């Protein structure tokens, strides 16, 4: 009690067909902190000790909350197969999107940040985006993406916004 910890926010059963096959992301018994159980913004949170990691003193209270979203971003970038020089669009410049942008930059990609908020796009530029596109007008945004990629489209598009229309945009914009 009182220790500073990072939390693995997903609980799985470990015994169902999917868990036994290594496909824990589709476990029907899954609980996710903040959705199916109390999350980190609750005054108190009960969570299994084996899903927590003690934070060392050299990780500040400001940095600690970025551990979980950073793992999401880095995992996605690793799975993407990105290569140095690839054109990458990151749709959504919230916490996960900005961390994803930085991970793609670290991998040597040219990154186009896409969002509906100009303030978020300014922050994306400060954090390393090579180009920014406001997608309030989807047709204009699609044309800008094509222009920025030589009429081919991004090699990879990461959808981090979670909006209804953004998965379709990601599929349509990405090169064939």
Residue map of PLM features:
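Loop/turn positions that initiate beta-strands
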Residues: 2-4, 85
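Helix-to-beta-strand junctions that scaffold the AdoMet/dcAdoMet cofactor pocket
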Residues: 174-176
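Glycine-rich phosphate/pyrophosphate-binding beta-alpha loops
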Residues: 6-10
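N-terminal Rossmann-fold NAD(P) dinucleotide-binding loop
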Residues: 97-98
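NAD(P)H dinucleotide-binding glycine-rich loop of Rossmann-like/cofactor-binding domains
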Residues: 11-91, 121, 135
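Adenosine-nucleotide cofactor-binding segment
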Residues: 90-93, 105-169
């Amino acid at each position: 009690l009182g220790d500073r910890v990072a939390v693995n926010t997903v609980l799985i059963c470990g015994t169902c067909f999917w868990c036994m096959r290594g496909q824990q992301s589709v476990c029907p018994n899954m609980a996710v902190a903040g959705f199916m159980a109390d999350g980190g913004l609750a005054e108190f949170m009960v969570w299994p000790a084996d899903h927590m990691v003690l934070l060392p003193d050299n990780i500040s209270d400001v940095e600690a909350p970025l551990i979980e979203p950073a793992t999401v971003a880095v995992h996605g970038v690793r799975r993407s197969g990105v290569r140095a020089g690839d054109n990458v669009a990151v749709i959504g410049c919230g916490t996960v999107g900005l961390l994803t942008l930085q991970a793609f930059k670290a991998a040597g990609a040219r990154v186009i940040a896409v969002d509906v908020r100009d303030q978020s796009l300014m922050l994306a530029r400060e954090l390393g985006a090579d180009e920014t596109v406001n997608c309030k007008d989807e047709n204009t945004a699609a044309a800008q993406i094509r222009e920025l990629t030589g009429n081919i489209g991004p090699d990879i598009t990461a959808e981090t916004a979670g909006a209804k229309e953004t998965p379709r945009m990601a599929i349509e914009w990405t090169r064939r």
